[in-house]
């Protein structure tokens, strides 16, 4: 990325400070993405990165912000290096800033090697197709929107919804069955409030999940560039753990909306022509450089699975951030404000959610043979129950047929028993599927048209009770 032709060359020609940007005059050979050392007249040092060059000018984004910097007497030295971060397995169990520096009061981290933070998306030709189930312990995800190793599956949330709570639960519970020892979580918190940091720290430490988790944090009051770097630093460590140490790594990024706001802030500082709702026209490409670093690589045992979380402004799923994210990723988990208001946690709207790779990661030999059929039946039955609720609100429940009233009972049981679960409750996939059969048994057997007859005879509670009584 960087052009090292001005390596070590120092300038005192800062002509303008624009937001968090420095404009340096008289620079001819600076490289895009090149690291810059900045020294103020007081001796205080800061770091920056070249965002733009041309016409003898270099535009530098300052990591720590420009507060206190004066054009007069400020020295800018171009290093000829790109932004790198030291990586090590010792980073598991630690809390770090966007640059991989410990902020938990612990000992310094001894790096095994240094890696380019900007990284590269995985070459499509080198990709291995994702087809191994990841158990999150959450029925609405495992049963109906299954996560597959190497997938990128975002969570679309809204302001005030419990996405942080859900993220902490997934980070604590998720595992690849039979591969528990080689499973790690890399958690990137982008632009969060300090109380949110304390929540995540407490959630991981209380349950012991911190031992297999590396946290990268940029707070809301930190400069935009720190928020831009945070998910990339997390993915840099994830790539090392996955493809050098053969680990299965789940990367959770919250909140990508904060990331996009930082991207818009930097774009505005550079006076770029805005696109939809003021976001830069290259936001799609920029998001792809993050999301496409997830996956499996041929010849490697490890993998990177991504669950980015974003809050939809005004709950608008057509907003540019969720809209562009949906084009790049392989489905979405959508949280519902209506379910949240009914006291259901996690408030996952399964009808609006989708996992495009689910079919390849479930079924016989992966989860259980009846899983695909049961998921289809749950979708069909719950969809009809929701439709009948609207009809009952108009004509009254007593005007519905007996079968329709059973669908209403199913819908209520589905939400209260299947969707709803405790924050500390971890369900295996077998428990999830058995629970699905329990709520489906409310419906007449002839209504279970999506499930093969042999599975009904084997797994339906009615036949299980008969089989148990005959033993």
From Swiss-Prot:
Compartment annotation: Cell membrane
Pfam family, one: ATP-synt_ab
CDD domains in alphabetical order: ATP-synt_V_A-type_beta_C, ATP-synt_V_A-type_beta_N, V_A-ATPase_B
InterPro entries xref list: ATP-synt_VA_C (IPR055190), ATPase_a/bsu_AS (IPR020003), ATPase_F1/V1/A1_a/bsu_N (IPR004100), ATPase_F1/V1/A1_a/bsu_nucl-bd (IPR000194), P-loop_NTPase (IPR027417), V-ATPase_su_B/beta (IPR022879)
Gene3D superfamilies documented for this protein: 3.40.50.12240
Swiss-Prot/TrEMBL keywords: ATP synthesis, Cell membrane, Hydrogen ion transport, Ion transport, Membrane, Transport
GO terms (BP aspect): proton motive force-driven plasma membrane ATP synthesis
Main location: membrane
Statement: the UniProt record of this protein carries the keyword Transport: yes
Any one GO molecular function term: proton-transporting ATPase activity, rotational mechanism
Organismal lineage: Archaea, Thermoproteota, Thermoprotei, Desulfurococcales, Desulfurococcaceae
PANTHER family named in the record: V-TYPE PROTON ATPASE SUBUNIT B
Membrane topology, record value: Peripheral membrane protein
Known partners and oligomeric status: Has multiple subunits with at least A(3), B(3), C, D, E, F, H, I and proteolipid K(x).
Name this protein carries in UniProt: A-type ATP synthase subunit B
Annotated Gene Ontology cellular component terms: plasma membrane
The keyword Ion transport appears for this protein: yes
Family from the record: Belongs to the ATPase alpha/beta chains family.
Biological function: Component of the A-type ATP synthase that produces ATP from ADP in the presence of a proton gradient across the membrane. The B chain is a regulatory subunit.
HAMAP family: ATP_synth_B_arch
